[in-house]
Amino acid sequence: RDYYASRGLGDVYKRQVLIVIAVVVLSIFFWFKGAYNGMVNMREAVSAQWSNVENQYQRRLDLIPNLVNTVKGYASHEENTLTEVVNARAKATQMQLNIDQLDEATLKKLSNVQGELSSALSRLMAISENYPDLKANQNFLDLQAQLEGTENRIAVERRKFNDVARSYNAFILQFPRNLVAGMFGFTSKPYFEANAGAENAPKVEF
């Protein structure tokens, strides 16, 4: 009787151990699953916000040919300024990057190229002060308003990108989620630096 009683107690103990192990394994699995899915969702949010930044950059690029042609019609001898804008636009067009290509070096290079374009556009818009007919041209006024709006949206979208990138980075770098991130190739994303106008819309003076 003692033998069977002790064996019964042993079976109960084994079942309890198995239950505890199963609970621990399931807890680890669900935590692991939650951490991984969270990283995927946050990485997708970063990618989506980067697309918003690129869309605003592209919108600005699309405005430039019409703007240059309009200014050229009234200030054709401002060749140097017009050429600067055209060249800066060409450089910016070549620097369109996928989110997976971004690191600190490439983002800094992109910011510099976009900053050069903003500066060239500011100089182009400033010459309207010397040409009253240009300044009064409705197409020019429309382009001016669109450009100002686009510059503001660029600044807003960059700030939003920094926010989601910081949240994503903080999430994947915290222990023990950093172990999951390392296993599945989740890497941190760079930020736009708050210098040289990177965080503020370039001011277009008239």
Residue ranges and their predicted role:
Residues 1, 11-206:
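A helix-centric hydrophobic-segment signal that preferentially recognizes long
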